[in-house]
Amino acid sequence: MNPPIILKIFNLACILVLCTYTGFAQITLDLEGGIATTGYNDVRIPGDGGTFIGLADELNSNPFLFGRVRLSYTFNERNTVSVLFAPLQVTYDGAFNRDVNFEDTIFPANTPIDATYKFNSYRLTYRYQVLTRETVTLGIGITGKVRDAFIRLEGNELRSEKTDLGFVPLINFHFTWQFSERFHLLIEGDALAAPQGRAEDVLVALGYSLNDQFDILAGYRILEGGADNDEVYTFSLFHYGVVGVRIHLPM
């Protein structure tokens, strides 16, 4: 799956909701970037027989740049449909102090290792604004998330990779508090926990309205989650320092 496909889904959703459009409508473009770091990235593949490794603890990693883009369509004031493309790819290097079984390949102790962790996320969201006050809004919705992921280890002519393409539903939420004429607090995200695993992607940010069309944001995002089953054990945590801009285009 790639960005053009998710945009086609968004266009289809917009066509469907336009059929019921009777009033206010707005397009919003969110552009987000900044610096991120790994909190932890723990892996055991296969889940029932591989070696437990902490990529961030046992190998070297550096802060990395990131970017995200989201396109939203709000209609009838309370309904919002959006698509998000959130790529993530991190590299680690170093050596393990023991033999490592990863995806049925044995990497001997002290082998120079290059590890790559990719977790691209494509999401389609519908949200309904359940609370609208003069200074406070709250929206609740559902997100369909497609993950395109892999974990790869390579070193000394050895190479092993575990790929994953899957779908998971999440609960979406969006809260704003307009505490002054131009400043607002924003808390939004997608999250869900189940016996098979969990996922949380939450942003807390301070927003400043330049005018009716442009907002700038600065804040903190946490991305955490993983799965635990016979095939894989993988849980990761990433911290994001976020800056962004939101462009509102009335229709």
Regions found by a protein language model. Name each.
Residues 25-88, 244, 248-251:
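Short glycine/proline- and aromatic-enriched beta-strand/turn motifs that initiate or cap beta-hairpins
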Residues 27, 78-81, 134-136, 181-185, ...:
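Repeated loop/turn-to-beta-strand initiation elements of outer-membrane beta-barrel proteins
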Residues 134, 165-167, 190-201:
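Solvent-exposed loop/turn segments connecting transmembrane beta-strands
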Residues 75-77, 130-134, 177-181, 210-212, ...:
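Outer-membrane beta-barrel strand-turn architecture
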Residues 183-197, 222-223:
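Transmembrane beta-strand segments that form the barrel wall of outer-membrane beta-barrel proteins
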Residues 198-251:
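Predominantly the C-terminal beta-signal and adjacent terminal strand-loop region
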Residues 39-64, 87-119, 148-166, 174, ...:
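Extracellular/periplasm-exposed beta-strand and loop segments of Gram-negative cell-envelope proteins
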Residues 31, 69-73, 124-128, 142-144, ...:
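Residues on the lipid-exposed face of transmembrane beta-strands in outer-membrane beta-barrel proteins
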